Amino acid sequence: MARILVVDDERDVATMLKFMLEKDGHVVETAYNGLEALGALGIEPADAGKPVPDLAILDVMMPELDGYGVCARMYEEPRTKLVPVLMLTAKGGMRGLHAAAPNVAAHVDKPFDPRALRELVGGMMGGRS
């Protein structure tokens, strides 16, 4: 079982991911913009008591703070620096930006194949479910 944070401003996408990943046995928390993600991670406001996820799935384009902004903040924080990030993007051209975000482990283009995403998450989590 892995702890996964899903962040997407499209609530139907976040809900579908939560349902799908929980079905695979993961514990999933959702947030709907970058600022909510920072709160869920215990970064802003600072809260060392918040559990650190094993994986963060972030949409690139979000209001308040985009996915790469969340990645940058995660990488600055010792507690979340090593959390792998899977980026969801509707714009394939955004993939090149991951060079500036060393914690981005993978990109998935929207719309995505749910089965392929589940397999990718399973592989990233070492088969933990």
Q: Whereabouts are the PLM-identified features?
A:
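His-Asp phosphorelay/catalytic-motif detector in bacterial-type signaling
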Residues: 51-54, 79-84
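Active-site residues of response regulator receiver
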Residues: 59, 89
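Acidic, metal-coordinating helix/loop segments flanking the phosphotransfer/catalytic sites
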Residues: 30-55
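C-terminal output helix
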Residues: 112-121
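Receiver (REC) domain active-site loop signature in two-component systems and cognate sites
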Residues: 62
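Charged docking surfaces used in two-component/phosphorelay signaling
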Residues: 15-23
